Amino acid sequence: MYPRQAWRAIKAGMPDDVIISSDIGNNCAIGNAYQTFEKPRKYLAPGLFGPCGYGFPSILGAKIGCPDVPVIGFAGDGAFGISMNEMSSCAREEWPAITMVIFRNYQWGAEKRNTTLWFNNNFIGTELDPE
């Protein structure tokens, strides 16, 4: 399934009061074009500085602040790898349920795309080992 298809399918099933957060990277940037909100403070965006690993901790904070509101986070496998240690935080006590969508393509996709564009398909260090 392509990221656009995943975003559309998930968006179709989202409740109106959901809080979402996306990380940085190609998969999440695609989704930014599909979200619409009727109320403020429903989208936690990483901003322009590229804080890789932002998506997961931000929905944890949103769930603590609004425990009765559903939260959904989106990240690529590389970005999630940076923040997955936060899983130990939410496992320490009884936490309300969250949803985290992880797009798996086994690469630092944005970096790979940029290096292939700028350096004539010469890239290194952008592949993630699926093992």
Regions picked out by a protein language model, each given a short descriptive name:
Residues 1-42, 46, 84:
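Cofactor-pocket helix-loop regions in the catalytic cores of large enzyme subunits
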Residues 30-131:
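Thiamine diphosphate
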